[in-house]
Every structure is written in structure tokens, then in C-alpha cells.
UniProtKB/Swiss-Prot annotation:
Protein name according to UniProt: Quinolinate synthase
Catalyzed reaction equations: iminosuccinate + dihydroxyacetone phosphate = quinolinate + phosphate + 2 H2O + H(+)
Cofactor detail note: Binds 1 [4Fe-4S] cluster per subunit.
InterPro entries linked to this entry: NadA, NadA_sf, Quinolinate_synth_type2
Highest taxon above the source species: Bacteria
Gene3D superfamilies: NadA-like
A Pfam family assignment: NadA
Species name: Thermotoga neapolitana (strain ATCC 49049 / DSM 4359 / NBRC 107923 / NS-E)
Name of the gene this protein is made from: nadA
GO cellular component entries: cytosol
Length: 298
């Protein structure tokens, strides 16, 4: 099946982009594997006109927004993000009425419609830097309350989370898990995602996006790392650092990320039917705050 996928991909001129949370078999056949920021940048640099995206819907939409002239297909239309879907345009409008002078910073894990109402988009890798560079001490941030809290801690700014209870179910690790991991692996470094709750972040040795997690073993010589994010990241880390040990903090599985399989990836290439499409006005309006992010990042 893998040979069939690679043959079809080449014949039809597709590039396969995969998120770090995809199953190992899909990561291994992808042309590029990365976090949402890395994938967004990669998509803009591609010469190819056809992209098979392995992730969830908001990420595929992001690729389409940045590459409206390219054909973007996905293996499973139902692969979505519950956290992104918690935030609605109506909620953003409500907060904007309450705080009319506060800029709206939206996490990339948001719908295309919501992005049209943002002043700037951010990712978990650059959220702190983006907010720090905005000339306002009050920020409206959504849809992840934990990332909002983390950014507030790092920048000292007043941040209102939209909605108040937005969070990623996969990253709701327990403080107890960190205690157990440290007891079991006393020499290990605990690395967690900023989408984790504050008590978990506070007990970790490092807090960072999946892209940042990849860089930690380059500067830290520890032999063992306990990783607090979706389990798909373990495969990426083991491939990059085969001489180190990577242990999941908990068995955290994103069922939506796992909807993509070798079988439906092959089917997607055969039929090219699940194409990502967005209205032109949505693409145009959602593109502005994304490009603003790149401008801020320099």
C-alpha cells in the first residue's frame, strides 16, 4: 500500500504534508512533517500545485488560505478540532463589543470564519512573541484558555480568553502524572505543550510547541525526555534522536488526527475527491491576519 501511495503521489504531482500527530506510517511517507507553523511556511514555499494534507480541518484550511491557487485534498473530511470549534464568530463579536480597543489574537487552531475577525494569528510556537510585539496591554485571545494563560504569564499583559472554557482535551494532563514521571525517571527532562494546564506547565522542565520540542534535545544532553503532548510526536523525536529515550507523559491520543490512515490516504490520491474549498471572501479576510503574523515574526 505504501508503494501504491508513493507511486500515485509521484504520478499525479502531489506533495504530502503531515502534522507531527499523524500515525508513524503516515509521517514516514510524507514529504514534510511539522507543526502548524512549519507546515504553513512550507506550504507557501512549494512549487507544486497539488497538496495532500494529513492533519485536521483547520490546518488544511490554513494551507488553502495561504495557497488559494493550489489544490489541497484531505483523506477524511470529518477530521476536525473540538477546541477550534468551541470558538464561534458570535463569541468574538461579543468580546469585541465589551473590549472595543483590544486587538484580537487568534490561535491557529481556529476556524477560517473566526480568522476573518482576527487582527493577527499566532501558533503555539510564536504566541508569546506575537503578543509581546502588539502595542496593547489588553488582548482578546482564543480559543485555548491554557495558552492564553501561558502567554499572559510570559508577557505580563491582560488577556481575556475566548471562550472562557476553551481547551484541548488531549492536553489535559494531570499534575500527578508529572510527579509519577519524575519519580520513575529522576534524570529525565519533562517537556510539555503550552496547551497543558498551569500546574502541569509549572512542574515541567520545558514548555514548548511540538516544533520547539524538537530543538530541546539538541541543547540538552539528557538521555531521557518525558513528552507531554499527543503521542504522535514520540515517533518524530525518536527518528530524529535515535540515541535518546522519549516517553509519553500519558497515552494522549487525538482521535481526529488518527482518522487519517494509509487506506484513506491512498483513496484520497485515487479519487482526489475530498478537496478543501473556501469562499473567496473568507480566504481574503482570513489571509490578512496570517500574513500579519509572518510580518511580526520578521
Amino acid at each position: 500500500m505504501i508503494d501504491k501511495i508513493l507511486k500515485l503521489k509521484k504520478e499525479k504531482g502531489y506533495v504530502i504534508l503531515a502534522h507531527n500527530y499523524q500515525i508513524p506510517e503516515l509521517q514516514d511517507i510524507a514529504d514534510f512533517v511539522g507543526d502548524s507553523l512549519q507546515l504553513a511556511r512550507k506550504a507557501m514555499d512549494l512549487e507544486e500545485k497539488k497538496i495532500l494534507f494529513l492533519g485536521v480541518d483547520f490546518m488544511a484550511e490554513l494551507v488553502k488560505i495561504l495557497n488559494p491557487e493550489k489544490k489541497v485534498i484531505v483523506p477524511d473530511r470529518s477530521a476536525t478540532c473540538p477546541m477550534a470549534n468551541r470558538l464561534t464568530p458570535e463569541t468574538i463579536e461579543e468580546y469585541k463589543r465589551k473590549y472595543p480597543n483590544a486587538p484580537v489574537v487568534l490561535y491557529v487552531n481556529s476556524t477560517a470564519e473566526c480568522k476573518t475577525l482576527a487582527d493577527v494569528i499566532c501558533t503555539s510556537a510564536n504566541a508569546v512573541e506575537v503578543v509581546r510585539k502588539i502595542e496593547s496591554d489588553v488582548i482578546l485571545f482564543g480559543p485555548d484558555r491554557n495558552l492564553a494563560e501561558y502567554v499572559a504569564e510570559k508577557t505580563g499583559k491582560k488577556i481575556f480568553a475566548m471562550p472562557e472554557d476553551g481547551h484541548c482535551p488531549v492536553h489535559q494532563f494531570s499534575e500527578n502524572s508529572v510527579d509519577i514521571a519524575k519519580k520513575k525517571h529522576p534524570d529525565a527532562r519533562v517537556v510539555v505543550h503550552p496547551e497543558c494546564p498551569k500546574p502541569v506547565r509549572d512542574k515541567a522542565d520545558y514548555v514548548g510547541s511540538t516544533g520547539q520540542m524538537e530543538k530541546i534535545p539538541e541543547k540538552d544532553t539528557a538521555k531521557t525526555f518525558v513528552i507531554g503532548t499527543e503521542v504522535g510526536m514520540i515517533h518524530k523525536l525518536k527518528k530524529k534522536f535515535p540515541d535518546r529515550n522519549f516517553i509519553p507523559l500519558e497515552s494522549a491520543i487525538c482521535v481526529n488526527m488518527k482518522k487519517n490512515t494509509l487506506e484513506n490516504t491512498l483513496l484520497a490520491l485515487e479519487t482526489e475527491s475530498f478537496e478543501v474549498t473556501l469562499p473567496e471572501d473568507i480566504i481574503e479576510k482570513a489571509r490578512r491576519p496570517i500574513l500579519k503574523m509572518f510580518e511580526i515574526m520578521g
